[in-house]
Amino acid sequence: MQATAVVLKQGEYRPSEDEPFMSERQLEYFKQKLLDWKEDILRESRETVTHLQLETENHPDLADRASSETDRALELRTRDRQRKLISKIDDALRRIEEGAYGFCEETGEPIGLARLEARPIATLSVEAQERHERRERVHRDD
């Protein structure tokens, strides 16, 4: 059987189940996807910092000040989530370099292209993730 990849617009590549799992081409695809995602987050973060610096003015109106503080708190929470996401992206990039990317940390089985396409930082297969979430619910209910 000959492996074929899905090729989209002019040179745009998309991994296919017909290829060997985590081939060099697939790894390069996911590496670039992760790097692009990280750059988008960093750009948004820089824009947030700039916006926060511009919004340091005092608002004489109490309602305006409260609204501004609420916006600032929301932006800071978003920035914290972005920082955590960058850490997960860096972990995924490290797994690519180590040859562990795309394989479930719990079972060692392939995570699957569809899941990685949707969530490139995934470390668990769908089944392992569901087991993990069930265990969390059981312990949370205790």
Question: At which residue positions do the language-model features occur?
Answer:
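Interaction interfaces in information-processing and related assembly proteins
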Residues: 1-98, 135-136, 141-142
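Cys/His-coordinated zinc-binding microdomains
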Residues: 34, 108, 129
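Residues immediately within or flanking Cys/His clusters that coordinate Zn2+
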Residues: 83, 101, 122
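Short cysteine-rich clusters marking metal-coordination/redox-active sites
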Residues: 104-107, 125
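Short functional micro-motifs and their immediate structural scaffolds
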Residues: 111-112, 133
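Short Cys/His-rich "knuckle" micro-motifs
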Residues: 114-118
